[in-house]
Amino acid sequence: MIALIQRVSEASVTVEGEMTGAIGQGLLVLLGVEQGDDEAKADKLLHKVSGYRIFSDENGKMNLNVSQAGGGLLVVSQFTLAADTNKGMRPSFSGGAHPVEAERLYDYFVAQAAASGIPTATGRFAADMKVALVNDGPVTFWLQV
């Protein structure tokens, strides 16, 4: 399971002209589900995402996690993160989880995030989405479990 996280001042996602989710300060989480992923991997990745200390403390040092910074999560499904780009000029998505399983684990990740007390907003699984964000930094990390 993969999360590409970006520290943002604000972010939103729109599907078919309707805003489905928005946050102020926090993390935009692009979430990719791979073959073989399960709830244990989702839990491990959420623990890493929610605990990752990439927000500045009072001394300007990256020392706070998203909760400590008073931020939220905007979780957006992103199957292209599971792409194999090693050969040719066209990505292969054979490493991605089957859509039914990917949606189940995406929903699980989102539910666990919300249950943890972090304000959590979402896009719509497998939809054509428009994501708007204001990067803060920019600060971007690839987390994979």
Curated annotation (Swiss-Prot):
GO terms for cellular component: cytoplasm. It is found in: Cytoplasm. GO terms for biological process: D-amino acid catabolic process. SUPFAM superfamilies: DTD-like (SSF69500). CDD domains: Dtyr_deacylase. A motif (Gly-cisPro motif, important for rejection of L-amino acids) lies at residues 137-138. Its main location: cytoplasm. Keywords: Cytoplasm, Hydrolase, RNA-binding, tRNA-binding. Its EC number is 3.1.1.96. It catalyses: glycyl-tRNA(Ala) + H2O = tRNA(Ala) + glycine + H(+); a D-aminoacyl-tRNA + H2O = a tRNA + a D-alpha-amino acid + H(+). InterPro entries: Daa-tRNA_deacyls_DTD (IPR003732), DTD-like_sf (IPR023509). GO terms for molecular function: D-tyrosyl-tRNA(Tyr) deacylase activity; Gly-tRNA(Ala) deacylase activity; Ser(Gly)-tRNA(Ala) hydrolase activity; tRNA binding. Belongs to the DTD family. Homodimer. PANTHER family: D-AMINOACYL-TRNA DEACYLASE 1 (PTHR10472:SF5), D-TYROSYL-TRNA TYR DEACYLASE (PTHR10472). A Gly-cisPro motif from one monomer fits into the active site of the other monomer to allow specific chiral rejection of L-amino acids. An aminoacyl-tRNA editing enzyme that deacylates mischarged D-aminoacyl-tRNAs. Also deacylates mischarged glycyl-tRNA(Ala), protecting cells against glycine mischarging by AlaRS. Acts via tRNA-based rather than protein-based catalysis; rejects L-amino acids rather than detecting D-amino acids in the active site. By recycling D-aminoacyl-tRNA to D-amino acids and free tRNA molecules, this enzyme counteracts the toxicity associated with the formation of D-aminoacyl-tRNA entities in vivo and helps enforce protein L-homochirality. This is D-aminoacyl-tRNA deacylase. It comes from Aeromonas hydrophila subsp. hydrophila (strain ATCC 7966 / DSM 30187 / BCRC 13018 / CCUG 14551 / JCM 1027 / KCTC 2358 / NCIMB 9240 / NCTC 8049).
